């Protein structure tokens, strides 16, 4: 991990810990999860919102006013709204994507769930996704949520990451292995 990325992850982790603990104490984890999913969707959909949280050209005051308006409009839970306001005042809104990931991980852990990052050459059908989740759940002993992405460059097969474990059954990796074996022989 690069130094700026690890600094961002550290900042996001501290905010995530505080937000999670406050939400857990007030039994508001479901509301927090809804709010972070809404915020993540807004970040994915809005170039203006991404620019707002990352641009050094936007002043603290403008960031604070804009993020407050966005939080109010979206109806985010108070603990997240207040944290975003504090982050804007300290010019730390750039860590919001990492904060969302950290909060999702904490909520899933509290529920005994784990998220599997799955990369496939074509989009998985609902049936395939459910079957994969069931198979992975049997292997890891927890409820598994699939976060699927499509990458045509893997040609076929799957790349599955659950926690620190990775299973790469993609055709690309098999071709690379074959290529390396041929280099050793010839």
From Swiss-Prot:
Subunit structure: F-type ATPases have 2 components, F(1) - the catalytic core - and F(0) - the membrane proton channel. F(1) has five subunits: alpha(3), beta(3), gamma(1), delta(1), epsilon(1). F(0) has three main subunits: a(1), b(2) and c(10-14). The alpha and beta chains form an alternating ring which encloses part of the gamma chain. F(1) is attached to F(0) by a central stalk formed by the gamma and epsilon chains, while a peripheral stalk is formed by the delta and b chains.
Name by which UniProt lists this protein: ATP synthase subunit delta
Gene name as annotated: atpH
CC terms in the record's Gene Ontology section: plasma membrane; proton-transporting ATP synthase complex
Lineage: Bacteria, Pseudomonadati, Pseudomonadota, Alphaproteobacteria, Rhodobacterales
Entry keywords, A to Z: ATP synthesis, Cell inner membrane, Cell membrane, CF(1), Hydrogen ion transport, Ion transport, Membrane, Transport
One GO molecular-function entry: proton-transporting ATP synthase activity, rotational mechanism
Gene3D superfamilies noted in UniProt: N-terminal domain of the delta subunit of the F1F0-ATP synthase
Highest taxon above the source species: Bacteria
Family stated for the protein in its record: Belongs to the ATPase delta chain family.
InterPro entries: ATP_synth_OSCP/delta_N_sf, ATPase_OSCP/d_CS, ATPase_OSCP/dsu
PANTHER family for the chain: ATP SYNTHASE DELTA CHAIN
Membrane topology of the entry: Peripheral membrane protein
Organism listed in the record: Ruegeria sp. (strain TM1040)
Location relative to the cell: Cell inner membrane
Function: F(1)F(0) ATP synthase produces ATP from ADP in the presence of a proton or sodium gradient. F-type ATPases consist of two structural domains, F(1) containing the extramembraneous catalytic core and F(0) containing the membrane proton channel, linked together by a central stalk and a peripheral stalk. During catalysis, ATP synthesis in the catalytic domain of F(1) is coupled via a rotary mechanism of the central stalk subunits to proton translocation.
Classification via Pfam families: OSCP (PF00213)
